[in-house]
Amino acid sequence: VDSLPVVERAWSNWAKGRGLDVQQVLDFIHGKQAITSLRHFMPGASEAEIQREHAVLEQVEAQDTDGVHALPGAAALLARLNTLDIPWAIVTSGSVPVATSRLAASGLPRPAVFITAEQVQRGKPEPDPYLLGAERLGLAPQACVVVEDAAAGILSGLAAGCQVIAVNAPADAPKLDQVALALSSLVQLQVGKLAQGARIDVVR
């Protein structure tokens, strides 16, 4: 799901309201849980104050879906996985209200395994979200392929021991040399079924 316009709109307004450098905030937040970013930029605040701020920001992000859409190739890829009976999950740094709202706006199907911020103590770039996703799928992390566009997500997938495909990731994202594939679009992915697992081909 491409929610970049919504994310940057919400956080830009939040940064301006607190007199913070907007670009500095935007450079930090991508792929991370909102609560992680709030704790980073509100170092002198109490946890209660941070939680109140989070509740307000969460409501803003959940209600604003203008510009949210499925990435090119995402719907076809998920349909192909379902046709081949290959299990898949969504592992997001968004909370339930935010992630549910954006998924609905994108028109993509909701998976059986949907990992959100509330389900892990440590979010991306820590490995916990993808470790939980693999566990819920009933697979070893090494048997899972993570598709990510954010630096924090790439680091999380690698730390979990998954194979990572970076799609339209920032050129300066760390550890890009360790990902299995680096692509510009999901349209380039073609998936086939093997006796055990899946085969991924790339259309250049």
Predicted regions and their residues:
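A generic secondary-structure micro-motif detector
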Residues: 1, 24, 67, 89-92, ...
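N-terminal helical cap/lid subdomain that shapes the substrate entry/recognition surface
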Residues: 1-84, 97
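Small/polar loops that bind or transfer phosphate-bearing groups
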Residues: 2-3, 29-30, 90-91, 148, ...
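Histidine kinase transmitter module recognition
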Residues: 14-17, 91, 106, 136
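Asp-based, Mg2+/Mn2+-dependent phosphohydrolase catalytic module
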Residues: 79-82, 86, 95-204
